[in-house]
Amino acid sequence: MKRRKRKYKLRMSRADLGSMPEALNQPRALNPQMLGGVQGALPWANGMLYWPTLDDASEMDDYDRAAVMRAARYLYKNSGVIRGAVRDIWLLQGCIMPIPTTQDREWNRKARAAFLARVASPAAFDVTGKLSWKTMQAWAERKTSIDGDCLCVLARGLDGGGMVAWYSAPKIVTPPGLGKEDGWNQGIKTNAQGRPVAYGLETAPGRCMIIPAASAILYQRDPDPAVPRGESDLIHAIRHGVDIAEIHGFTKASVKLSAAVGFVETKPDADKAPGMAVAIGAKKKSGCEEKPENPAQSFEIVTGGGARVVSLAPGRDLKAIYDQRPSPNVAAFIKDLLAEIAYGVGLAPEVLFDINALGSAAARLILAKLKRWIDERKDTREVYMNRIYRHVLALEMEAGRLPRCKDPAWENVAWVGQRDLTIDLGREGGLAMNLIREGLADADRWTLATEGM
């Protein structure tokens, strides 16, 4: 006898339903998802985008940095485009000079004179005896554009005065036997907050000296709190620069080859190689035997000139080779690559590579943007120059060559650059004089902006 299965039904009253949690009373719904709504997150929309880490401190290791420096130095030595861009980046900025701004005006005058007397002499200011204040800034800016950074060690001379010793980026290394577990990364030791506490300076292959951070300056562009070292201005332009150099090299080789050949002798189709019938061994018809050719050519000197007349066999012709490379498409492509290089530096391509393409209105706008770019670069440089300025004046006061300042804030200083770039000094000068006359502008500031230091 089969037992019947009982069916149980769950019956709940309205009161029971009211006592249940509110979430159970609601119908179930899927969590909202974009499902590819953000186009930049679609992995199949483009080719492979290789970026293996999101840790800022690990974006570049020692190998990557060395590879970028080698490529950038190669381009600087062998590419006129890159060499000119690096030099123009410095020339557009120019050097900056200090003006003491303490409340002790007499001390300001003496401090400026003592500072300039010290830094104007390479023998007294630079350990190697090669760099003065202005040439030091030019060297540091060019090295930073190529290598990404450099190290300035604050030193003391035999007379007790302030000196500096500069070292290029490859000299900044991690001491042997130390690594990230010891706080070292790419030649810099940082504390738990990411603040540099020491630098590793290579003195000989396999030997390293540890320099306290208080005695050194890591001169770099766009300092990032999460990134230990600076990046080259050319880091985005490495492949573009190599491509331009290769295109120029191949084009030059083709032009030289075509110039070496010059002419090509041609012959009609009837005189070319035998056809398929002869190739497969067919017999020639009677009466169709080929006559032997006389390939000899005679050259005759034309009387009254140096030209030569070439005598060719019947049916032969000479054609000159004219090389049409680079084509307009290749020239336009190279121009696009140059624009990529300029944009990566932060400048308009017309400023670095094609200033003649600017009109008057566009030139004023680009010069205004250029001034902002120069100010941004100078803001970073002033931080480093402030430390050198304080180092020199502090040792001058300690040595007794400069009296003590009556103002406790003896470190106050203003920095003035070279004169501003302009294409219409007359119009801007007239406007400035009207503003000064009405008390809306400062005459000293305008003079420094137009004349510089």
Question: What function would you assign to each model-found segment?
Answer:
Residues 220-365:
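Extended, charged amphipathic alpha-helical segments
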Residues 103, 131-136, 155-168, 272-283, ...:
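Charge-rich, acidic-biased intrinsically disordered regions
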Residues 105, 127, 306-425:
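Surface-exposed loop-to-helix/strand elements on domain peripheries
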Residues 1-100:
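N-terminal-proximal low-complexity accessory segments that begin disordered
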Residues 131, 154-156, 254-259, 351-356, ...:
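Short coil/turn segments at secondary-structure boundaries
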Residues 77-229, 435:
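Structured, mid-chain assembly/scaffold modules that mediate subunit interfaces
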Residues 422-453:
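Charged substrate- and nucleic-acid-binding regions of tRNA-handling and nucleotidyl-transfer enzymes
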Residues 96, 347-348, 402, 441, ...:
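Short coil/loop linkers at secondary-structure junctions
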